[in-house]
Structure formats: structure tokens, C-alpha cells
């Protein structure tokens, strides 16, 4: 149908910017168009001889399916990139499609994770802790607090990884459920420990005293 053609044309045009956008691309396919893509992939995967032009399209079709599916569980360590350092293609797309998470690419991925989750699905993520307290991230904080449930949060601070020796990158990891808030969550701060090993030891010694707010 014309709708299917238009949706697939949009998807393939969007993928021309895949080097800049990666997995934050939104294809917005109708159920019927997605089913067509799925059936096409399944058909050619059963064939022993696949024309070269089809082979070239199969990876694109698989990407479309992956980014239009929903998941019960996701685990992410997203890229960090402040909005001011994004190229024009990425900046425009994030502003138009992930406005609440536009401050940094890692907050964009927080919204992406929620979009990809099934109802009551969960995602775990480690990223920079700036979204937890900086005023410029109030939009993403409000969205998370109002629309999801924070199951647990671990404030890691600096030197989370042995290869990161400075104070610039300070981390937090957390687990979130894609549902309306239903409990207060568990919280632990190990940021006072100054090495990766010390954080691990502090976590093990304190985990039975997790703070429930």
C-alpha cells in the first residue's frame, strides 16, 4: 500500500544518517509495515541463494526490526556527548525527537530505553551522575520521577573504572521499571571510596543497609 511505501521510504532515508544517529533512530512503522519487513526477512533467511541487492537490504531490515521491537529487559552503557558537541544532524534529530533528553546523548538513551521497553519492563544503565542533580537536567529528572519507577540507584562517583583516574567522569548506575511509580526504591552511595576496588568493598559491606526512601 501507499502507506507502507511511504513508511519504508522514510526509514531508508533516515538510515542515510545512521552514522550520526545510530540506534536512536525512530522508524514509526505501522503494525502492517513492520509485519511485511519481518516476513521479508524470514523469507530470505530460508533461501540458500540471496540476490546481492537483497543481501544489502537485509541488514537494514534487521535494524528496523530491532529498533521497532519492544523488550522486557535492557542493559546499557550509553555514549556521553554534551549537546554542544553534537554535529548538526544529531543535534537537530535529538531536539525534535528526544527534547526532554537533549542535554546529553546519555539522557537521550534513557528515553530510548523507556521507548523500547514493554509495559513493566526494566532497564539497567550506568551513566554520568549529572542528570541526578544539575538544574539543566530537571526535565529528564521530572520525566523519570513522574513516568517510571526507580527500583534502585548506586551513586558511584569518580574512578568507577580503573582506567579512569580523574574526577571528570562521575558515574551513577540504576535500574528503572517502565511503569507508573509504585515504590520508593533502594539507594546506596559509594562515591566516597576513591578507587574501583574500594567502591566494590564498600558496596559489599553496606548493601545490607541500603537506604529506602
Label for each model-derived stretch:
Residues 65-213:
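Signature of N6-adenine DNA methyltransferases within the class I
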Residues 1-69, 73:
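Class I S-adenosyl-L-methionine-dependent methyltransferase module
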Amino acid at each position: 500500500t501507499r502507506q507502507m511505501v511511504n513508511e519504508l521510504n522514510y526509514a531508508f532515508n533516515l538510515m542515510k544518517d545512521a552514522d550520526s544517529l545510530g540506534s536512536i533512530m525512530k522508524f514509526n512503522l505501522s503494525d502492517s509495515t513492520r509485519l511485511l519487513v519481518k516476513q521479508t526477512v524470514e523469507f530470505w533467511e530460508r533461501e540458500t541463494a540471496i540476490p546481492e541487492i537483497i543481501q544489502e537490504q537485509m541488514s537494514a531490515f534487521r535494524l528496523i526490526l530491532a529498533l521497532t521491537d519492544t523488550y522486557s529487559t535492557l542493559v546499557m552503557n550509553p555514549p556521553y556527548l554534551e549537546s554542544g558537541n553534537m554535529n548538526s544532524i544529531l543535534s537537530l534529530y535529538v531536539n525534535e525527537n528526544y527534547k526532554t533528553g537533549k542535554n546529553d546523548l546519555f539522557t537521550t538513551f534513557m528515553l530510548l530505553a523507556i521507548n523500547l521497553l514493554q509495559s513493566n519492563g526494566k532497564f539497567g544503565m550506568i551513566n554520568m551522575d549529572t542528570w541526578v542533580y544539575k538544574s539543566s537536567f530537571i526535565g529528564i529528572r521530572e520525566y523519570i520521577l513522574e513516568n517510571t519507577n526507580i527500583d534502585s540507584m548506586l551513586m558511584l562517583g569518580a574512578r568507577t573504572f580503573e582506567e579512569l583516574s580523574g574526577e571528570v567522569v562521575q558515574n551513577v548506575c540504576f535500574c528503572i521499571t517502565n511503569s507508573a511509580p509504585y515504590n520508593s526504591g533502594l539507594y546506596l552511595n559509594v562515591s566516597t571510596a576513591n578507587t574501583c576496588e574500594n567502591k566494590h568493598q564498600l558496596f559489599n559491606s553496606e548493601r545490607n543497609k541500603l537506604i529506602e526512601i
